[in-house]
């Protein structure tokens, strides 16, 4: 038993990895070193204790025409002769292949360099230098180019990356690299985009008598949009068309229009958004105006979705373009028409998530990102709306099923309206477990449209130029004193310019002699507005040209009378 226990303990030591199990003779090491170049690389790498790039602002998001600064840190175990260090600034596009046969191989990736600029920061290949053991720091700075750049992107089908790379070269050994990626964002201003037109889709029941005539008239008035969701659904609804109207045509839905739609059994849906561009984190308000031919309600009648369409081109065959759709966020609202007018106005909101890519168009090269606001109208009570996890939206069973997307809601639920029961959900915004729009489009009496929007990085407010107004010229403004408002208020209470001039002379006791003061047009502008007054200007000319002797004599007489009333001082 004692020998068996010793054997078990020895086996346990061997399984744990005792040092004796990994001993390699020096002869084997020398022979491997002479045969393998990988050992040479590891031998060069064994000299390095630390080799990294430290940016001065690591977490900063950079923009074009800015300068990146940092330090290359190198800590060596001992002296290394004949080395040189290069610094490279690289930007690269990369595409991933969808072919499962080439997954994991070099053919599964295709890359193209946006730019590559390099320079030597220590030594050169023609003139290598010596590095002593210890820590070395090499500061650097490189400017980001301002042309032909796009924002940093990393998604399933590809990526756009930018980084700073340091290369340590030595003679007869492969170089050693270290990288430091950074985020680049190209500013896209959405403040200059124009206001979009109102888009309208009109559906007509197949039971209508003048179905064909009505549809032909609508098609002549406006052209259908191939991007709209209604294009593949009109065959099921009997007839429909999409019209793009101006802002003035949105107010034509009166009683006569409603009666005409009721006679033709036509449903008219108009969608309006305030602008075409939005920034990351903003809300997209979507206003939907529905005119029905009868009273209608559905707890999930309107679904608005922010959709990203990605088009990836094949670099080896530019004619092959793959299109991918991704739903970013979604808004659901109930549809209830008024019992009398059969109309409804619903406001939905879509908030652009913070991790959304900006709109991108690389001119048929690599990939493109376009965003659309897609609105679907469910015009049948029989159509049930489900999410991707088969959760019923707007049904009686949703009251007992917890909604995982409630914590992602961007605004509070609206109050119940009309015949809405407690179990039906009100308008809400989803960021996960979205409604399966493709499944909903296959149902009857479902139509929709889409409006392209631009997702940018910022919005600059451009104030409109104010109309020109008549103002004082700069010469007359410079002549006005600082207390011109106080002088103007005092002069406005005077009875006439003559009385004002007399009061001014009478109350000036300690100043210079009033006889030397002669009023001119410039003096009078201090007391009156700059606008010319004909009556006052005529009297002012007469007053300026007359003699001031009468006013001066009265002043002297008053001063003499005041001195006579004073008692004379006794003589000394």
From Swiss-Prot:
Pfam families: Arrestin_C, Arrestin_N. GO terms for cellular component: cytosol; plasma membrane. InterPro entries: Arrestin-like_C (IPR014752), Arrestin-like_N (IPR011021), Arrestin_C-like (IPR011022), Arrestin_domain-protein (IPR050357), Ig_E-set (IPR014756). Residues 237-257 have a biased composition (Low complexity). Residues 221-257 are annotated as: Disordered. It comes from the Eukaryota. SUPFAM superfamilies: E set domains. GO terms for biological process: ubiquitin-dependent endocytosis. Signal peptide: none annotated. Belongs to the arrestin family. PalF/RIM8 subfamily. Required for the proteolytic cleavage of the transcription factor RIM101 in response to alkaline ambient pH. This is pH-response regulator protein palF/RIM8. The lineage of its organism: Eukaryota, Fungi, Dikarya, Ascomycota, Saccharomycotina.
